[in-house]
Amino acid sequence: VQEYVLWYQELGMHDVNRVGGKNASLGEMISNLANAGVKVPGGFATTAYAFNEFLEQSGLEAKIHEVLDSLDVDDVSALAEAGKNIRQWIIDTPFQGKLEDEIRTAFVTLQGDAGDEASFAVRSSATAEDMPDASFAGQQETFLNVKGYDAVIVAVKHVFASLFNDRAISYRVHQGYDHKGVALSAGVQRMVRSDIASSGVMFTIDTESGFEDVVFITSSFGLGEMVVQGAVNPDEFYVHKPTLDNGKPAIVRRNLGSKLTKMIYSADQSHGNQVTIVDIDPADSKTFSLTDAEVESLAKQAQIIEKHYDRPMDIEWAKDGADGQLYIVQARPETVRSREDAQTIERFQLKGSAGIVCEGRAIGHKIGAGQAKVLGSIDEMDKIQAGDVLVTDMTDPDWEPIMKKASAIVTNRGGRTCHAAIIARELGIPAVVGCGNATDTISTGDSITVSCAEGDTGYIYNQELEFDVTTSRIDSMPESPTKVMMNVGNPDRAFDFARLPHKGVGLARLEFIINRMIGVHPKALLNFDTQPEELKEEISDMIAGYESPKEFYIQKLVEGISTIGAAFSPEKVIVRMSDFKSNEYFNLVGGYQYEPDEENPMLGFRGASRYVSEDFRDCFALECEAIKRVRNVMGLTNVEIMIPFVRTVEEGRKVIELLAEQGLKQGENGLRVIMMCELPSNALLADQFLDIFDGFSIGSNDMTQLTLGLDRDSGLIAHLFEERNDAVKALLSMAIQAAKKRGKYVGICGQGPSDHEDFAAWLVEQGIDSVSLNPDTVVETWLYLAENLG
């Protein structure tokens, strides 16, 4: 017997041909994962058989295929005309008795005691949808807050018609699907009241790098369509799976989205408008739309789903404001990252620089350049020529035909999981989304470069810049004669860099985190109450979403450090405590009140001297608290501490005492405290310093300037800066031998070995334990060392 309607709990992934990917997946989760803690709202689906029989018995099938067989889909106006006619025919044709009876019976059961107040979502599920090689982002329609039987029947009709959207017709032709081989199933599902809570999308993989140890969650207030479409810039969270599995706090990143609008149920339904878009209260926009506990609960559900399907997943979720529960409303295989070749790495690097016109969230890691075309609406799509950069407010599936032609895409609105981002990834072109003002700051005809090669933030430059692309194979790296580690400053790039061959991080700098993720002088946060009014306002905006100014500083450090720690776990990550100079601290918000005006900051109030001074001690305590949380609370004990610029043995002792006072005792929980060996005094008295510290990491930049008496910020004598000078090498050799003799760690994290392969080889010959390199030189230097010393 062929069924017309099936309940979700009767369905599983083996039913894709009967009810399409979306409905089969909902059934799969309800049948298999309900007891494991995955909550999916109930519902039923019409079958592909019902759809095909409806078209056949009504005589529509022959009419439709007659039109499609002769259609040239690249003729935009002919496509629009054909699509419109076909959809109208379907909507005007009544359902046969049996199909309508079965839908009515199922609907009455689903409605239960709630009566006509109950609201439903009616979604399309195509039988060829979510084939792992095509993500069909939003190809068919969704109807929300549908109430009452009559409205449900109308919605099901529209869902059936949506199989013949212009974009769906064109997509099938371009992907090589036969129109007759695709059918449509309508899913009718109880609505989750996220209109009075929040909702969003999550991936069980990092969407940009393919890093598999995190769950990436986006969230905003109201119904989830806004996040999916990219109509809103959502909050973002990254959760580290191994830490979550260990029962520890596992959120390694939080980004507060601007969240200006939300979609809610409409009070006036007379025109069939079941939903409406309203502004979000500015105070709400400045808070996160999920609590930490909710973020972790979602990540747990995501992991259960991923384990069950045994592949990376793309999941839509919704929080019910009425019962406070978190529900999964859709799950499908993640289609882009999991297809990529993990064994080759492509690197894009800009060659020049230019003025920055605007910035937003970077999608992918590529660079694109061309002539800007700023489009106000889809009606202007014929303006786009192949190779142009598409600039617009936001995109939806109707834009797909022209997105294929663009060399890059720039939007005002949207987050990492919005429509523009998904399609850009699928097409392999760079996109910068959520810029806010791109359509104002860029004009049609401008020559621009869109760069996603610089981390989480994507930049649009005001001219066409040249760039290099290098491809390296990393599957068969030879044995290296020493540990090759990496220098990582920007947590935004950590997941990406972790794909390179490595033995951990020899230098994780706090400066980038303080400068870019925090941006405020720690003293200005500690003394927030006494700041001038306008400064208070500026700081309040920057710390939105965090419970206090002090907590903001600590939390942001925790996020930056734990992101790098998690990305490279279980390998060591050596975190250097802050090494800003007074002029750099001066430039942070509020910094002018606290920093001296030094003649030569390079040789002034920096490093260990700063930590032990009365003036800075309370700021250093914040850094210590952050390290403590990463190691002791989150359990990332692969994170170690490094102290920079220790001028005297006495100063070294004071820092170790200070760390212990702050709860960071050497040896406790395996904690090592490494010293930057970067002053001639460090090498000359290496033995005495090694009495105090657990090892050395050589800072060749400072060692060179202090040995040769150069200011490395001065351009006049820059040509004399050379870490391969014999005097510098003599000191480095002393330091390496001293550490070897004591059986203590010695590595190098200065620029030298990244710039000069022969210098790296010399260090290995001296017996150094590790060389820590800039990510862009890791593969080349590794191969050089293996070839020449292996």
What positions do the PLM features span?
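N-terminal beta-alpha lobe that positions the nucleotide/phosphoryl donor
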Residues: 1-187, 196, 285-293, 301, ...
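Conserved alpha/beta-domain cores
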Residues: 107, 121, 126-136, 140-144, ...
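Conserved metal-phosphate-binding beta-hairpin within the catalytic cores
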Residues: 138, 310-335
